[in-house]
């Protein structure tokens, strides 16, 4: 087992900018720039961290898209009560054409011994007592892929979502893939640009504050912003841009065929075939401007394969040996 306590934390205060780059990253004439973020955490900040990373009774398992590995499906069923006991709702509302995918998920879960069924919640039923009572019977909830904005606009603030959250707080497992992963945070990336730049090329590569549109998500994954298909679609720019706008939140980039399990004990565990990348700017030095190019220093990045653990409270990483057949 290998442990990492992170890197050196920069001092609080103004960040010196040298030729347009942070001190230590370039050379040239210096000017002063205001920064956000900063050094050590005071008592109020520590209390805020405690609220952001408070522990629910349930587990959250989110996949970065692509094929969901069998080991991840097995873990989901186990967390929902195990074979014969797990009763799982498959919720396909992120897509208007997801019935076939949802039925495939049901077949996969049933093949692992769970009782699973598709639960399609219509806009007219989101505050229905009958729907809420139906949802209360499940021990697991799985959100399929599509467009996270469809899920957010349909369910946020509704009785249906409150019923799912109540089950989560009582010990149920909530999961999803692709859009069903992004929607789990309190603030979610919509995939849209808030401030388009001058060229398509610049939009693809820039890291800048104020660029990405965020919208309310479900709020099950507190203290984080999630992006999916991360390595396969080269989404570093949009997740880092969002983290610079909200440095109190940890950026979580999940690759395809890979999952992050947010455990009831507060630990984050990586499952699957590729990586979860974590961007932690809670103690970073960030230049407070909205120019076309971001300026920041001391952002921690962790690259975690299967078996990797992250403790968001203590900012610690552990790597565990994984047996590969």
Model-derived features: positions:
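N-terminal secretory signal peptides
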Residues: 1-10, 17-23
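Glycine/threonine-rich flexible loop motifs
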Residues: 148-157
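C-terminal and late-domain segments of enzyme folds
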Residues: 39-84, 99-111, 188-190, 194-325
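Catalytic-core regions built around general acid/base machinery
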Residues: 134, 157-171
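Portal/gating segments that form or line small-molecule/metal binding sites
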Residues: 96-133, 137
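Catalytic nucleophile loop
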Residues: 144-145, 168-188
